[in-house]
């Protein structure tokens, strides 16, 4: 029998406050927030409302959507600082982007982004390595310590599915009573 852990809306609000506090403790502010469908949209929107920072959505549902993830070139260009028509008056071109998901479970979602974004925007440029963890950062409500992705900057609740298999139920998933 798999153990289940249920998060309440109060838990989610506290976790989002914690992410904002961690981000500001780093003196880092994103130009925009990206909520990953489906689980990252709600916490990204809450963080956006708390901070007044605009929010975008990106579909990277590797498990539940048979159509697969969507590539997003303009976010990759923002992350890299790519400019199609260079301007002499332009300031810093790289945008600070916070990518939010409910859980870093296996690492597949975040690893997909780290592979996809460079593939569409100057894939051979070595400076992509300076983007991740600097101007593009990752935030999750829950971090699985057994994940294959080790670059989440902001998180609130840690689990280790290699030690104890647990099924996490977020309030937007707990719809049995409807």
Region locations from a protein language model:
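Short, glycine/charge-rich flexible loops or terminal/linker lids adjacent to PRPP-binding catalytic cores
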Residues: 49-98, 105-115
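Active-site-facing substrate-recognition patch
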Residues: 1-30
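Conserved glycine-rich SAM-binding loop
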Residues: 39
